[in-house]
């Protein structure tokens, strides 16, 4: 079986049979699958958002952990504002694209590219952080696996990549069960914990964390740091807005309903977990997560309900990365359409998924996981900057949008988006100030670097379009064509190449590089019989180089006729087995590479298929 057949069968086994374009509408999300695929990032963040707040407050003393509750309510209020703002964006921009499209239409090129860079970087970090956190949950339960955490993170990236390459509908089916399992298990935990609180059956959780004397003074900076840490609960909110075209018709209505459901669930679970952490006097620990401690306290130990919560939490943390797999390729395709990234990212694969974007996201996330050793705490400081940059630009762009339209109720709409822009802008400043010392400055550096690359890519495509333009061009000149057939001997492949060459031009020459005089004399004798009147050019090579004399001769012919074409016809063996290639030199490939960037020189191969 040929190599192409083996590769094709392997591809079909991994990603399934191709899907025709006319079935694209069947591959879209319902609200049920849309909530699972596009909201898993936002929903999963509640698993560690409360803990991130407590980890800062405990630096002062256990006594100030109660400040987590008002901080959580403030974050919940901001989340509600952002969701209502994005809901307006969904209806105003049903084509998707989120912050990039809104900023491009209303704020101009530069803000749009900043938004795009922020989102693309954040999507890569979403995959890395989510998978690292999920693997951390596994290795906490099975410490022996800790040494293999990098391999495990890469394995999960591979699973997510293959799942998404199979297409939108199948990825929705794969990821719906873990998402809803997490939602129901956490809501059950909160409901049972609330019932225990109402009946007065709450007992503080036993912990191995030593009680430490007061450390730092509770300052405004520490409160802001705790607040910025808790804002991880807001990551992923923009995913639904970016993925509107992935929904079944009516797209905007289904996406808006999905966003409201996501907001209600996220706020309920985040505030519920924070209240339970306060009720059970949970102290953050390096050995056990806050959700684990709450589940242990609510369910009275490590029974099956506890393991159900932990298992669901682990799954959602890993699968939260799937939100990025839904949105990164789609945003990249929009940027490719606008010529800011390579055009290959615009193409859909066999399964109507943006395959190149999916593979690229997997590669970048894998690099991050390897560089940072799969450590969640090393990756989290890089998080959130991109989110709030895109939030702020999107909402500011919507204010301009409503001011330009001035339709019914435009002032109310502009006020809602203006409030969203102001709030997210303030949060962005807080996050940038409190996270820069922990590595967020890298993201602040990467965003302008990406913008520079976007603009450089656009300049390249614009220059290509200018050079390819037919404006002012006349096709009045007839060009001659000199055809050269390099050969290493006289055989069937050469004779076949000569027959083809004679169909291209009347000026055909065979070219042979002489290294051995005896072999050259023998070849000249054979050429009289098989050359069919085609002139034979023999090039001497005193230093035994095959390439240099040939390239010099091609350059000489080209210089003699600078406005005409020179065509190189290469006789080329095609072995019956892929491994037979090792028995043949790759001279044809070397010639192609050497002539690739030479103008007016055309290189073509005439394959001679060898039988088995």
What are the language-model segments listed below?
Residues 160-195, 258-262, 380-392, 412-423, ...:
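Membrane-interface loop-to-helix entry segments
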Residues 194-201, 257-293:
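Extracellular/periplasmic helix-exit of transmembrane alpha-helices
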Residues 54-104, 109-113, 129-156, 263-269:
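Extracellular loop-to-transmembrane helix junctions
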Residues 208, 344-355, 391-436, 467, ...:
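C-terminal membrane-solvent junction of multi-pass transporters and transport-like membrane proteins
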Residues 109, 147-154, 246-269, 336-370, ...:
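Loop-to-transmembrane helix boundary motifs in multi-pass membrane proteins
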Residues 24, 180, 185-235, 434, ...:
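Helix-loop-helix junctions that connect adjacent transmembrane segments
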Residues 1-21, 462-612:
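Cytosolic C-terminal regulatory domains/tails of membrane transporters and channels
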Residues 182-209, 273-281, 392-407, 456-465:
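Hydrophobic alpha-helical segments and their helix-loop junctions in multi-pass secondary transporters
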């Amino acid at each position: 079986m040929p190599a192409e057949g083996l590769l094709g069968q392997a591809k079909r086994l991994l990603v399934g049979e191709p899907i025709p374009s006319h079935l694209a509408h069947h591959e879209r999300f319902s609200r049920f699958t849309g909530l699972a695929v596009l909201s898993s990032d936002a929903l999963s963040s509640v698993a560690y958002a409360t803990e991130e707040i407590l980890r800062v407050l405990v630096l002062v003393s256990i006594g100030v952990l109660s400040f987590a509750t008002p901080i959580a309510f403030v974050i919940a209020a901001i989340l509600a504002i952002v969701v209502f703002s994005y809901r307006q964006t969904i209806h105003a921009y049903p084509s998707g694209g989120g912050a990039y499209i809104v900023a491009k239409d209303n704020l101009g090129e530069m803000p749009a590219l900043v938004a795009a860079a922020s989102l693309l970087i954040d999507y890569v970090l979403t995959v890395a952080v989510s998978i690292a956190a999920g693997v951390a949950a596994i290795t906490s339960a099975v410490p022996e696996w800790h040494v293999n955490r990098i391999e495990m993170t890469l394995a999960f990236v591979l699973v997510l990549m293959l799942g998404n390459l199979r297409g939108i509908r199948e990825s929705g089916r794969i990821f719906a069960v873990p998402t809803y399992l997490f939602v129901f298990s956490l809501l059950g935990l909160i409901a049972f914990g609330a019932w225990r609180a109402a009946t007065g059956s709450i007992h503080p959780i036993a912990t191995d964390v030593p009680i430490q004397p007061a450390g730092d003074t509770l300052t405004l900076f520490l409160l802001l740091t705790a607040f910025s840490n808790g804002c991880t609960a807001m990551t992923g909110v923009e995913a639904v807005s970016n993925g509107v075209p992935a929904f079944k018709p009516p797209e905007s209505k289904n996406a808006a309903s999905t966003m409201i459901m996501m907001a209600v669930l996220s706020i309920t679970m985040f505030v519920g977990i924070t209240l339970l952490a306060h009720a059970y006097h949970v102290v953050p620990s390096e050995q056990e997560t806050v959700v684990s401690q709450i589940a242990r306290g609510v369910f009275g130990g490590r029974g099956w309900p506890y393991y159900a919560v932990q298992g669901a939490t682990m799954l959602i943390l890993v699968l939260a990365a799937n939100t990025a797999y839904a949105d990164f390729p789609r945003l990249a395709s929009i940027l490719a359409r606008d010529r800011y990234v390579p055009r290959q990212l615009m193409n859909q694969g066999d399964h109507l998924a943006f395959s190149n974007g999916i593979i690229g996201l997997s590669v970048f996330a894998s690099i991050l996981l390897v560089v940072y050793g799969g450590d969640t705490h090393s990756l989290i400081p890089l998080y959130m900057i991109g989110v709030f940059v895109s939030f702020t630009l999107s909402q500011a762009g919507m204010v301009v949008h409503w001011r330009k339209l001035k339709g019914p109720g435009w002032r109310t709409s502009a006020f809602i988006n203006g409030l969203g822009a102001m709030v997210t802008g303030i949060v962005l400043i807080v996050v940038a100030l409190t996270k820069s010392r922990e590595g967020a400055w890298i993201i602040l550096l990467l965003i302008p670097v990406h913008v520079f690359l976007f603009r450089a890519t656009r300049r390249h495509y614009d220059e290509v379009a200018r050079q390819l333009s037919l404006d002012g061009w006349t096709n009045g000149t007839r060009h001659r064509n000199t055809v050269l057939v390099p050969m290493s001997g006289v055989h069937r492949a050469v004779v076949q190449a000569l027959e083809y060459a004679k169909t291209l031009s009347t000026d055909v020459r065979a070219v042979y590089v002489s290294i051995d005089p005896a072999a050259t004399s023998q070849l000249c004798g054979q050429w009289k019989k098989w050359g069919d009147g085609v002139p034979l050019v023999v090039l001497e090579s005193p230093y035994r180089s095959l390439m240099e004399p040939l390239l010099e001769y091609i350059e000489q012919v080209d210089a003699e006729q600078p406005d005409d074409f020179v065509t190189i016809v290469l006789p080329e063996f095609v072995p019956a087995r892929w491994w037979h290639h090792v028995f043949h030199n790759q001279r044809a490939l070397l010639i192609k590479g050497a002539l690739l960037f030479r103008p007016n020189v055309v290189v073509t191969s005439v394959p001679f298929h060898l039988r088995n």
